[in-house]
């Protein structure tokens, strides 16, 4: 059911999705779908929570381990891009829901396992103080890392058109970003 719902929500969005279409795609009747998920919003939240629960633990592990900021950036970039290769619908899905319902993320934020950047912020501040990193706000650095990793997935059709790449060539380009993005960010913040 969740896989069918994910596919319909991904292609039609929350507002365009219909419970009957989801039931048909899942090979069940609509009454059964309503038995498990009383309404479309509850089903959507289950799909979103399921998808987010796959990514959040990875982010938390990277953000809260004891490695250097450079290593965190490399691990985050590589893991995020590998994860998105397996779940390419997720970034657009999240952005779409945040635009449709900004309060939804506040509910998510209260869930156990929501990524916490406090240790990352402390580490950035310490590495700046130790002269390892150029002066930079930890929040700005985190936003830069997120933006450079998320945007190529959210804007895939646009970027494919700009770069004149088909799916296979675009996927190769994305694979190279595992090192390109990390190198770009690290070279911009590291004191050499």
Feature-to-residue mapping (PLM):
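C-terminal peripheral helix-coil segments that are non-catalytic and often amphipathic
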Residues: 79-82, 86, 114, 118-134, ...
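Hydrophobic alpha-helical connector segments
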Residues: 60-92, 130, 138-142, 175-178
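Short hydrophobic clusters on alpha-helical segments that form packing/core surfaces
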Residues: 1-9, 80, 185
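Helix-turn-helix
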Residues: 8-42, 46-47
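Amphipathic alpha-helical linker/stalk segments
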Residues: 47-75, 117-128
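Residues in soluble alpha-helical coiled-coils and helical-bundle/repeat scaffolds
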Residues: 27, 38-42, 46, 64-68, ...
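Amphipathic alpha-helical segments used for helix-helix packing
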Residues: 85-106, 156-164
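Amphipathic, non-transmembrane alpha-helical scaffold segments
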Residues: 2, 44, 48, 52, ...
């Amino acid at each position: 059911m969740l896989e069918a719902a994910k596919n319909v929500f991904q292609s039609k969005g929350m507002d365009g999705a219909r419970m009957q279409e989801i039931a048909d795609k899942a090979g069940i009747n609509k009454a059964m779908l309503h038995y498990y998920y009383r309404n479309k919003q509850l089903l959507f939240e289950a799909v979103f929570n399921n998808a987010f629960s796959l990514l959040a633990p990875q982010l938390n592990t990277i953000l809260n381990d004891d490695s250097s900021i450079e290593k965190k950036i490399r691990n985050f970039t590589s893991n995020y891009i590998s994860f998105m290769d397996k779940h390419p619908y997720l970034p657009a899905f999240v952005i779409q829901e945040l635009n449709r319902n900004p309060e939804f993320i506040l509910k998510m934020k209260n869930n156990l396992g929501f990524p916490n950047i406090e240790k990352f912020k402390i580490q950035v501040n310490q590495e700046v103080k130790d002269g390892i990193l150029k002066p930079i706000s930890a929040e700005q650095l985190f936003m830069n890392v997120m933006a450079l990793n998320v945007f190529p997935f959210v804007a895939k059709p646009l970027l494919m058109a700009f770069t004149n790449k088909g799916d296979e060539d675009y996927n190769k380009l994305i694979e190279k970003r595992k090192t390109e993005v990390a190198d770009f960010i690290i070279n911009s913040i590291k004191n050499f």
